[in-house]
């Protein structure tokens, strides 16, 4: 229901703003821009996202099936089970969904978006199997989605690569700020959903895992900043991500071989579902992308940024960060739009400027909430999303606020 009202609001708000621009400012091109944008968004949803996703989904669902036959998913479920059983109490012990979620979070941590999406869709399908109300998002599905939308990433590889292309003196200088901001977003999302679902986080297992993850991140930050040069950080990030991913593939294959599984047939069996899954999500994907495009092309976001700037000026708050806000505002709506805005900001202000760096941290501090909701819930036919969107946006907001503070600390 929330998604229904939100979708309607995007169109109505865009229409009202466009009408004001036409009547009071003589902008005769605004409605053409919006209508052209609807066709472009629909095309992008199918040709640039859904169809390429067919190949990726086919590959990784095949690999995942090999992993399941090899027992790797159950192995991961047993390791992470004690922690996940506390924050996902609805998921039975050693259920495959646990392993699928671990694979998704791991791919996100490594910044491997192409692998994370198939893992995430598989996890959502596994959670749907134990969902008693197939039209309504379960507590476990909401927790998973909010943690996913917080976008916890250790290695923002694509952002560092874009900074290098634009000639940044130190492309990796946003590495630690991105890690801190996205970690804050994840923790806030976890706590908020746990409170809503009455999950006790003051548990020795939960505290131990969260403490261990925090120490691991702190150790990584210390090691990267004290023992590696800027160039080495980029090389290690790039090599480690792809090495770990390919190692997982080989481990799945060897594990299946050890169990005398016909590996190729297992791959084909899993890969068959790739096309079906992508066809299922196309209507949800196109509907959300068109609504987002309408809102963006109407100029609503620009007016919101101007309003924030006016408020901050009158409150006596430093407004050096406001030119980077469009990236933060577009990120929950569109990953490609946020990337384009980040690049445009760096081109306008310079990749080594405060605003340029902050736009990069914004881009790495959270994920595309509305896209993920449409994609993941659409893949399993969820129509009632309950509180998934507001809590996902809360995690995004926490990441944005953290990004501002961290950027002032590191770059201002």
Model-derived features with residue positions:
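Generic serine detector
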Residues: 41, 77, 85, 106, ...
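Short glycine/serine/threonine-biased micro-segments
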Residues: 12, 60, 69, 109, ...
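Sparse, context-dependent recognition of short Cys/His-centered cofactor- or disulfide-binding micro-motifs
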Residues: 61, 95-97, 137-140, 242, ...
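Membrane-embedded alpha-helical segments and adjacent helix-loop junctions characteristic
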Residues: 29-129, 259-348
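C-terminal transmembrane helix pair
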Residues: 115-116, 123-164, 168-199, 325-412
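Signature of multi-pass transmembrane helix bundles
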Residues: 1-55, 164-296, 313-314, 387-412
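Short hydrophobic/aromatic segments of transmembrane alpha-helices and their interfaces
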Residues: 39, 98, 135-138, 246-247, ...
């Amino acid at each position: 229901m929330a998604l229904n009202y939100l979708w309607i609001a995007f169109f109505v708000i865009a229409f009202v703003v466009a009408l004001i621009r036409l009547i009071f400012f003589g902008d005769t091109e605004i409605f053409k821009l919006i209508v052209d944008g609807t066709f472009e968004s629909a095309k992008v949803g199918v040709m640039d996202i859904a169809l390429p996703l067919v190949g990726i989904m086919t590959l990784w669902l095949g690999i995942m099936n090999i992993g399941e036959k090899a027992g790797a998913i159950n192995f991961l479920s047993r390791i992470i089970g004690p922690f996940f059983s506390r924050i996902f109490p609805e998921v039975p012990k050693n259920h495959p969904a646990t392993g699928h979620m671990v694979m998704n979070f791991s791919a996100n941590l490594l910044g491997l978006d192409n692998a994370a999406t198939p893992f995430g869709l598989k996890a959502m399908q596994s959670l749907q199997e134990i969902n008693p109300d197939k039209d309504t998002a379960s507590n476990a599905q909401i927790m998973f989605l909010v943690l996913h939308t917080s976008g916890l990433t250790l290695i923002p590889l694509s952002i560092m690569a874009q900074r290098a292309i634009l000639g940044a003196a130190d492309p990796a200088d946003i590495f630690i700020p991105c890690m801190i901001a996205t970690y804050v977003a994840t923790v806030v999302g976890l706590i908020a959903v746990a409170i809503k679902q009455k999950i006790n986080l003051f548990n020795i297992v939960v505290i131990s895992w969260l403490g261990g993850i925090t120490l691991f991140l702190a150790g990584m930050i210390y090691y990267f900043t004290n023992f590696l040069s800027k160039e080495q950080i980029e090389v290690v990030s790039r090599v480690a991500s792809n090495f770990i991913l390919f190692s997982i593939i080989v481990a799945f294959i060897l594990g299946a071989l050890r169990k005398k599984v016909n590996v190729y047939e297992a791959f084909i069996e899993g890969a068959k579902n790739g096309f079906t899954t992508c066809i299922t999500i196309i209507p949800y994907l196109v509907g959300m992308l068109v609504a987002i495009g309408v809102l963006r092309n109407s100029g609503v976001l620009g007016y919101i940024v101007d309003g924030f700037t006016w408020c901050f000026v009158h409150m006596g708050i430093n407004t050096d960060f406001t030119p980077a806000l469009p990236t933060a505002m577009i990120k929950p709506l569109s990953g490609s739009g946020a990337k384009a805005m980040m690049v445009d900001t760096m081109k306008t202000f310079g990749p080594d400027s405060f605003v340029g760096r902050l736009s990069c941290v914004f881009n790495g501090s959270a994920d595309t909430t509305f896209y993920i909701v449409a994609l993941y819930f659409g893949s399993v036919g969820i129509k009632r999303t309950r509180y998934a969107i507001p809590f996902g946006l809360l995690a995004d907001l926490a990441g944005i606020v953290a990004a501002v503070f961290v950027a002032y600390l590191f770059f201002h």
